[in-house]
Amino acid sequence: MAIERTLSIVKPDAVSKNHIGEIFARFEKAGLKIVATKMKHLSQADAEGFYAEHKERGFFGDLVAFMTSGPVVVSVLEGENAVLAHREILGATNPKEAAPGTIRADFAVSIDENAAHGSDSVASAEREIAYFFADNEICPRTR
């Protein structure tokens, strides 16, 4: 199995409801290590840049408005098959379709306010991590 890194964002809805610790605990219980994290209030430019691939889609404006509505917690997670493991912990994008016990089933209220973001591939993870973190901000854990 491959050790990978993935980007995780606890979105404004989950931050405002104080779910950060519970969400982090689920990552750690699943064997994912938090190797970088920061709380940040995204600017419009930050959100537009991060979600640029969705610029032509109808939901883009609402997504940017939501992601800039309050602080987020951006993290790099590391572990075996981290991208897939993280996405399984998050559950389906639409919380109504998310399996019980997943983050979105437990903490999200709608497909628009769905508690968290996770990279969808190793290539996306590399791009997304670089968007928020310099190499020297990531602390590999050896113990």
Curated annotation (Swiss-Prot):
Which residues participate in ATP binding?
K11, F59, R87, T93, R104, N114
Which residues are catalytic?
A: H117 (pros-phosphohistidine intermediate)
Superkingdom per UniProt: Bacteria
Q: Which UniProt keywords apply?
A: ATP-binding, Cytoplasm, Kinase, Magnesium, Metal-binding, Nucleotide metabolism, Nucleotide-binding, Phosphoprotein, Transferase
Per UniProt, subcellular location reads as: Cytoplasm
Role, per record:
Major role in the synthesis of nucleoside triphosphates other than ATP. The ATP gamma phosphate is transferred to the NDP beta phosphate via a ping-pong mechanism, using a phosphorylated active-site intermediate.
NCBIfam families registered for this protein in UniProt: PRK00668.1 (NF001908)
In Swiss-Prot or TrEMBL terms, this protein is called Nucleoside diphosphate kinase
Originating species: Acinetobacter baumannii (strain SDF)
UniProt gene name:
ndk
